[in-house]
């Protein structure tokens, strides 16, 4: 009976640990008609992790589904570190409240968002770098350009 209770307890811990890792909800505005003259996307976040932050980056969509992107925009305005953790904010992370924006480019080193699919890549920050549970690939496109 003791073994049964121990196994049951471990099972419940495992179930609750996996169920608690829901991904952050990320909404981009605009998503399908980003202005070529003012290429700024407003990012709305909810369900952010409470123990670490996330990174958002403009990248080329990965060639193989499920893999991390290999070409991301190196411009500082095209990357964001967002965290609800106060210590992270003191080190430069953006608070997830209010207006969070990211500037995107049609072209960047090793990237072409005019002729190929680009994404906002969401991933856990350096405090949870091995945890892939937040990885998201959110497509966007510029106004008047190729439909995806």
Label every model-predicted segment.
Residues 1-22:
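Secretory targeting and sorting signals
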Residues 22-148:
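Extended, solvent-exposed regions of the mature portions of secreted/cell-surface glycoproteins
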